[in-house]
Amino acid sequence: EKVHVNITSFNRQVLLTGEVPTERDRQTIVGMVEKLENVKSVVNELAVMPVTSVSSRSGDLVVTGKIKASLIDSRDLFANAFKVVTERNTAYVMGRVTQREADSATNVIRNVSGVNKVVRLFEIISEEELRNLVPPPPPPEKAAEKPQK
């Protein structure tokens, strides 16, 4: 195994992580992804280095799981708004979120054991845009109301 490439997409932004043997391989992969239909932008985080071990990748998966659990536990964040990838102890975080959510999520992730660095790849939206994305809560049921005879 000479190449290890992860392709993660969120809202037409593509994140490339992993390891390739040469700069030429790195540029070839980026060029291929940039030509794909509906790709708005490519974030190239491919490292020119030997491929990481299976145990290193497994450790990254554990860290990603811890991050997701921490986002779920956070009361002021909607965990599904974030896509998280961990590669070599660097957490890459994608999402369409408000500045408040981006800052809060970054603080949560920085405190997760095993995270050495956080790379923010957010599309920042306004609080008003967020309100428009979230469906209104259903009206409360009137338990005391009885059908009229």
Task: List where the protein language model places each region.
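N-terminal targeting leaders
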Residues: E1-K149
